[in-house]
UniProtKB/Swiss-Prot annotation:
Transmembrane segments: 7-27
Protein species of origin: Rattus norvegicus (Rat)
GO BP term, example: positive regulation of heparan sulfate proteoglycan biosynthetic process
Subcellular localization, as worded in the UniProt entry: Golgi apparatus membrane
InterPro entries: His_Pase_clade-2 (IPR000560), His_PPase_superfam (IPR029033), Histidine_acid_phosphatase (IPR050645)
Family, per entry: Belongs to the histidine acid phosphatase family.
EC number: 3.1.3.-
First-tier enzyme category under EC: hydrolase
Catalytic activity line of the entry: 3-O-[beta-D-GlcA-(1->3)-beta-D-Gal-(1->3)-beta-D-Gal-(1->4)-beta-D-2-O-P-Xyl]-L-seryl-[protein] + H2O = 3-O-(beta-D-GlcA-(1->3)-beta-D-Gal-(1->3)-beta-D-Gal-(1->4)-beta-D-Xyl)-L-seryl-[protein] + phosphate
Name by which UniProt lists this protein: 2-phosphoxylose phosphatase 1
Active site positions, chain numbering: 97, 379
Assembly behavior: Interacts with B3GAT3; the interaction increases the 2-phosphoxylose phosphatase activity of PXYLP1 during completion of linkage region formation in a B3GAT3-mediated manner.
The keyword Manganese appears for this protein: no
Residues bearing carbohydrate: 194, 305, 354
Length: 480
């Protein structure tokens, strides 16, 4: 018996040591055997970098991995967190579409072979993927605002079409929807079980990738939803400016911002040399390569762990990718410093922020319609909103990025309402320009709705030039 007990103790110790060894290897605290070129000793054709913690300096590969937003374990999020005496009243969600096939092809190279059919046996996978496809097949008679009715409800091409949503993109938004369901429906009961169509507001641009992303999130949020209760409105503008899109001053800011981008590119000799090398490899003029926006296609290769394209003269490589990605990061940094993009953002984001504030005010008055709002959009939609809110440290919108506005009511003081702003699950409320110092001089744990209302109705115009008091005057004034 004594020997048996000793054996069991030794066996337990051996198991513990094995677990510690694997854990240390996973967190890169002890070395793993590598080949001469630094790769894993296992033979692999393609290597996907896997940083565990954020590097101390800006790393283009790490930033690119964050941008890919590859589905993995359930993420930690702060949506739905509030003191117990607060009641959730309404939620307004802005998303960027999920992972997509490139919008541009690099001339004289083979397109990346990405399958855009939805297959349960292929990674990334989601438990609701097959059910999602089955439900989409039942939606052929869905009534959406024109021209959305002519778009496919899910991606289904063996070789993706340009700009098409991939299986990764669908899974990203199924995850988003399920996360929001767990928080807002199961925990906070935002919608009743017999919810009605007027309690949802759904809007998307006319691209299949945004409609399909919206449907994937909606299915994760409301599995097996009734098609008769779902109506997507079409938004012609990526800024979601509806009837307020004409804004001359906004266009002036954009032109000057594009000029700034051009001048920064000219100053980057590393970037120009890299474009020259890449153009020589694919045997086209440098100007033609630059116009093809090669980083768009290379990001698809990178996110899907597919080798970069080659020609008879060689291959585009990771060093080329790093140089272009590093320039993108530098461009974002300078963009925030020069403030031209900030002026563009204030005017570009005002219509959609004004709509959101109006909905929140109605909900605060007790209206029970449009309790859950979803805008399925693009990076060029979310980026101006983030900038206008003063979230200068926010990363550029990744695939399937989500920006959430929550409206809360204080049960102890029912006339008082508060807002929370969350970006990819992080609470950024007290980083916004309208609430960044509120907690310094107030004991209240939440940011008052009035702060956001005042910001949208007045302070956004003050930040532009101080003389305008409404959107029309600001758009037709002088300032850029």
């Amino acid at each position: 018996m004594l020997y048996r007990n000793r054996f069991l103790v030794l066996l337990a110790l051996a198991g513990l040591l094995a677990f510690l060894s694997l854990s240390l290897q996973f967190f890169h605290l002890i070395p793993v055997s590598t080949t001469k070129n630094g790769g894993s000793s296992k033979s692999r054709k393609r290597i996907m970098p896997d940083p565990v913690t954020e590097p101390p300096t800006v790393d283009p590969v790490y930033e690119a991995l964050l941008y890919c937003n590859i589905p993995s374990v359930a993420e930690h999020s702060m949506e739905g967190h509030a003191p117990h005496h607060y009641k959730l009243v309404s939620v307004h969600v802005f998303i960027r579409h999920g992972d997509r096939y490139p919008l541009y092809a690099i001339p004289k190279t083979k397109r990346p072979e990405i399958d855009c059919t939805l297959v349960a046996s292929r990674k990334p996978y989601h438990p609701k993927l097959e059910a999602f496809v089955g439900h989409m097949l039942k939606g052929s008679g869905a009534s959406f605002e024109s021209p959305l009715g002519s778009l496919p409800l899910y991606p289904n091409h063996p070789l993706c079409e340009m700009g098409e949503l991939t299986q990764t993109g669908v899974v990203q938004h199924l995850q988003n929807g399920q996360l929001l369901r767990d928080i807002y429906l199961r925990k906070h009961k935002l919608l009743p079980n017999n919810w009605s169509s007027d309690q949802l507001y759904l809007e998307t641009t006319g691209k299949s990738r945004t409609l399909q992303s919206g449907l994937a999130l909606l299915y994760g949020f409301l599995p097996e939803f009734d098609w008769k209760k779902v109506y997507f409105k079409h938004q012609p503008s990526a800024l979601f400016c509806s009837g307020s899109c004409y804004c001359p001053l906004r266009n002036q800011y954009l032109e000057k911002e594009q000029r700034r981008q051009y001048l920064l590119r000219l100053k980057n000799s590393d970037l120009e040399r890299t474009y020259g090398e890449m153009a020589k490899i694919v045997d086209i003029p440098t100007k033609q390569l630059r116009a093809a926006n090669p980083i768009d296609s290379m990001l698809c290769h990178f996110c899907h762990n597919v080798s970069f394209p080659c020609s008879r003269s060689g291959c585009l490589g990771m060093e080329h990718f790093k140089v272009i990605k590093t320039h993108q990061i530098e461009d974002e940094r300078e963009r925030h410093e020069k403030l031209l993009y900030f002026g563009y953002s204030l005017l570009g984001a005002h219509p959609i922020l004004n709509q959101t504030v109006n909905r929140m005010q109605r909900a605060a008055l007790g209206w029970r319609d449009e309790l859950f709002t979803l805008y399925s959009a693009h990076d060029v939609t979310l980026s101006p909103i983030l900038s206008a809110l003063g979230l200068l440290e926010a990363r550029f919108p990744r695939f399937a990025a989500r920006l959430v506005f929550e409206l809360w009511q204080d049960r102890q003081k029912p006339s008082e309402h508060s807002v929370r702003i969350l970006y990819n699950g992080a609470d950024v409320t007290f980083h916004t320009s309208f609430c960044h110092d509120f907690h310094k001089h107030s004991p209240k744990p939440m940011c008052p709705l009035e702060n956001l209302v005042r910001f949208v109705k007045r302070d956004m115009f003050v930040a532009l030039d101080g003389s305008s008091t409404n959107y029309y005057d600001a758009c037709h004034g002088e300032g850029a």
